Amino acid sequence: MSVVDPSLIERIIRDDVRAMGAYHVPDSHGLVKLDAMENPYRLPPALRSELAARLGEVALNRYPVPSSEALRAKLKEVMQVPAGMEVLLGNGSDEIISMLALAAARPGAKVMAPVPGFVMYAMSAQFAGLEFVGVPLRADFTLDRGAMLAAMAEHQPAIVYLAYPNNPTGNLFDAADMEAIVRAAQGSVCRSLVVVDEAYQPFAQESWMSRLTDFGNLLVMRTVSKLGLAGIRLGYVAGDPQWLEQLDKVRPPYNVNVLTEATALFALEHVAVLDEQAAQLRAERSRVAEGMAAHGGVTVFPSAANFLLARVPDAAQTFDRLLARKVLIKNVSKMHPLLANCLRVTVSTPEENAQFLEAFAASLQD
């Protein structure tokens, strides 16, 4: 029996937090795991052995170097961060989103993003006490420029997020629409920081990184998770040092551990291997999309990510039938009305994709 008085919890913990549910990660043991947009490929055995030796030299008894200078320099080199721009590291991009919300949390401040979109934009805003304003996409998941500009004028957001490509829809927003939003946020409509979230850039091969020098209100955020390093939890944001100097003030000390730093440095030294894996997944994406779309009643939406969004006649039923066949995907149909009967499927290895397509066909026929 618990010795905790529930009334004490009610007194201490915020009402909105008590009303929430914790982020749920489903058990994937024994399943073909296609729910979390992970890169299915590990490093080749020779590189794994080399990495193990490298990690064996890491001084676990010492705190990390707070500035992570070597890793930041390597990221700027490999990811072609423009001269004069800097990078700030986070324990995954989730932490960077939280830092942005915390740093911008003035009374009455708001965060804005198209919806459906990445759930952490809204969650981090709520945790920090900011209001989140979601602006619906069009029915085909394209960006509604007019609606965005009108909402920006009305709400005057502190931060506007644009995911490129978007999660969970997978599409790239029109570049002209995005530029109109960035320019409008420079003062003609509102004065806002625009954060372009490029978590899936390895699969999109499109980027706003080179535009950082064009706009003083622009940051570009990425993660190494989708490159095949989800287990080390490393995200980074690139932009003008004046912005990053402010974010650094709310960054937890030693937030990137020594094993993460060493692993990321090693992987960036062998980025050609990761690029090859991304190319394989892009090729598989086309094959899986064609296989899914071959079934009547199934609509597969264009994707520039390592996952596919599809609308099926009955999302809940199809999800359950796939799970019964040991295939785990993501049922996103309850996330937003625009996602009615939609499922999100991670693109994986040829073998796992074949298992999925076979199970998918059978699930539609049951």
Curated annotation (Swiss-Prot):
KW Mitochondrion (keyword) present: no
Signal peptide bounds: none
Enzyme Commission designation: 2.6.1.9
Catalytic activity reported: L-histidinol phosphate + 2-oxoglutarate = 3-(imidazol-4-yl)-2-oxopropyl phosphate + L-glutamate
Biological process according to GO: L-histidine biosynthetic process
Annotated keywords: Amino-acid biosynthesis, Aminotransferase, Histidine biosynthesis, Pyridoxal phosphate, Transferase
Top EC group: transferase
GO molecular function terms listed in the Swiss-Prot or TrEMBL record: histidinol-phosphate transaminase activity; pyridoxal phosphate binding
Sequence positions bearing N6-(pyridoxal phosphate)lysine: 226
Pathway noted in the entry: Amino-acid biosynthesis; L-histidine biosynthesis; L-histidine from 5-phospho-alpha-D-ribose 1-diphosphate: step 7/9
Pfam families in UniProt: Aminotran_1_2
Cofactor(s) annotated in UniProt: pyridoxal 5'-phosphate
Assembly and oligomerization: Homodimer.
Family as reported in the entry's similarity comment: Belongs to the class-II pyridoxal-phosphate-dependent aminotransferase family. Histidinol-phosphate aminotransferase subfamily.
Protein name: Histidinol-phosphate aminotransferase 2
Species of origin: Cupriavidus pinatubonensis (strain JMP 134 / LMG 1197)
